[in-house]
């Protein structure tokens, strides 16, 4: 017995599915979650689903002739029991897959917690769950795991565009605190005296700078200079682009 259904995707989910309307031969005893993820849309991207103007949950078994509407996160007032992926509460904190090193550094530069460096997907998921982190990835497979709650599929492979994507998706501009995190390890930076870090400073730096910061986690020392000025200009340009929705 055939089970042909139609799924209509809305908003950002259209990018993931590749089209707005999909006609699918679902097969026997398939849930709407199975069908949505088969089309390339991880459950972490789905906020709610309707069938004939009624809300449904992920384990709804699809039936021949069904037409489902699938929505991304939005500000509509949805009954709590039908919110399929809850909104992340509090200051967004991330864990990135091993292919997103440049994005991790950009997020850290802006003061956003971005854990990075774990190769194994199982370990990424475990850390995300234990520390309530949002998984950022280009790999849809990791976000299709049932145990994963928070995650985002990056649409672009350009780190600067990825930064824009994540900023707009999670309103990160509300939490930007530039130069407060270590770009190497994600640790928090604290102000230190020149005397306290002299042994770690090149001679020219000792002669030129008086203000320093040190990573509480790895001990790396930071100071101003051309690199700092270039990053400051990048941040200024990026913030303007966010407000104008450009970049």
Give names to the regions the model predicted.
Residues 182-185, 215-218:
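Short cysteine-rich clusters marking metal-coordination/redox-active sites
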Residues 10-12, 98-102, 137-142:
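Short, polar loop motifs at secondary-structure junctions
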């Amino acid at each position: 017995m055939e089970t042909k259904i139609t799924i209509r995707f809305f908003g950002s989910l259209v990018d993931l599915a590749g089209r707005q309307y999909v006609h699918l031969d679902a097969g026997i005893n398939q849930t709407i979650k199975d069908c949505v993820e088969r089309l390339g849309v991880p459950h972490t991207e789905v906020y709610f689903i309707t069938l004939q103007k009624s809300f449904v949950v992920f384990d709804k078994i699809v039936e021949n002739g069904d037409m489902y509407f699938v929505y991304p996160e939005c500000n509509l007032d949805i009954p709590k029991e039908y919110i399929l992926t809850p909104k992340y509460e509090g200051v967004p904190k991330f864990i990135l897959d091993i292919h997103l090193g440049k994005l991790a550094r950009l997020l850290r530069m802006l003061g956003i917690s971005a854990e990075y460096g774990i190769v194994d997907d199982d370990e990424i998921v475990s850390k995300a769950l234990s520390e309530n982190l949002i998984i950022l990835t280009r790999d849809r497979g990791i976000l299709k795991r049932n145990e994963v709650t928070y995650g985002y599929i990056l649409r672009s492979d350009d780190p600067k565009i990825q930064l824009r994507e994540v900023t707009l998706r999670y309103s990160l501009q509300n939490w930007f605190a530039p130069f407060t995190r270590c770009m190497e390890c994600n640790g928090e930076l604290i102000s230190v005296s020149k005397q306290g870090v002299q042994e770690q400073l090149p001679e020219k730096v000792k002669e030129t700078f008086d203000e320093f910061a040190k990573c509480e986690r790895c001990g790396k020392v930071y100071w101003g200079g051309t690199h700092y000025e270039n990053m400051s200009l990048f941040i200024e340009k990026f913030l303007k682009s966010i407000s104008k929705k450009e970049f």
